[in-house]
Amino acid sequence: MPVTTFTFGQDDNNIGKKTTRFKGETGRTYLVSFVSFTDYGEDGLPAEDASPAFASAHRIYKAGVGNVIVDDTNKSEMESLLKKESRHYVGTVLCVWPTDRQGELDVESFKKGKGYKIMPWILSATRYPDLARCHKKFPFPKHDLSMTCSDGQYQSFTMVSDPKCCLRMYLDSKNEVFQKVGSSIVAEARKVFDKIGREFGREMTIDDVREALGEEVSSPTSSVSSEQMESMLDDLEI
């Protein structure tokens, strides 16, 4: 993950704050907008032809270690060490709008520009085709998504496109206050997406994982011939 820089009073609003990922509660319906985008204009708002932006990673969960991100360079060795196959996940950023349990928008909170939450969402890549089908029929930049959680433990959802888009209602409003709310949502979501890699898990070396598992960590060894040693000493004039 990239290192970010900041100073007192500048870009330090989220320092020390723990990001809360979106997780559904069984029996509850949510209304969400996709708020990270593939392209932005000079004004910082999503470009006309922008689509929702996603990230992806393979990871393995191991009790006592957590979620470990794997890639092509260590996949085979990590799977052997953790005795599990890696799974593919995708991530994006949602604006979860204030609603009742049935997913009906809290209009009063919406009018006040309050009650929404900007949250990263990590889901199994097996669910991505469901999102793609919804997007193909009703593009997300112009429509919201209604999601009913049928199983909070396994994060199973029934997903249906919603005809409105709450984010666009803010951005396209003639009311400058609403426009500013929309702009602030986009700006915050962009920062969250820039750091979404950390939401997938931890980047660890093989030795890091061995140490977390309480196993012996390999130590680097090297052998130097007597001729090489003499040459090194000669170079040092010893």
Question: Where in this protein do the model-derived segments appear?
Answer:
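OB-fold/S1-family single-stranded nucleic acid-binding modules
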Residues: 121-122, 150-185, 204
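Generic recognition of cysteine residues
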Residues: 95, 134, 149, 165-166
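OB-fold ssDNA-binding interfaces and closely related basic DNA-contact patches used
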Residues: 1-137, 191, 195-225, 238
